[in-house]
């Protein structure tokens, strides 16, 4: 799985959120290997706590820059880790992230 720009996305997320990041997970068609040229790159960002306006703006700006740079749509969904853990076996979306997702980065 070679997704141009994915490492840059992960590095950018870590630079913005630092110790708040619990896990970064690739999910969707790229994780399943069913992607096409029209597929977006779906990434779940599991954080300890919520976004503030400043970090949300930085994330949005970085993602837009990567979308333009690589002519690919990176779609980043931010999820509070406590909420994710509570509902991971119930909510279909969270189950999908757990079952099909590929962990790109995980806190030690």
Which functions belong to the PLM regions below?
Residues 42-46:
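Short beta-strand->loop micro-motif that forms the acidic, two-metal-ion catalytic signature
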């Amino acid at each position: 799985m070679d997704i141009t720009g994915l490492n840059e996305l992960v590095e950018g997320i870590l630079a913005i959120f630092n110790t708040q990041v619990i896990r970064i997970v690739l999910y969707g068609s790229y994780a399943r290997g069913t992607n096409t040229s029209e597929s977006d790159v779906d990434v779940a960002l599991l954080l300890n706590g919520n976004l503030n306006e400043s970090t949300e703006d930085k994330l949005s700006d970085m993602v837009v820059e990567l979308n333009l740079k690589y002519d690919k749509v990176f779609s980043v969904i931010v999820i509070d880790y406590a909420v994710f853990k509570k509902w991971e076996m119930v909510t279909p979306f969270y189950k999908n992230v757990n079952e099909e997702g590929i962990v790109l980065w995980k806190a030690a």
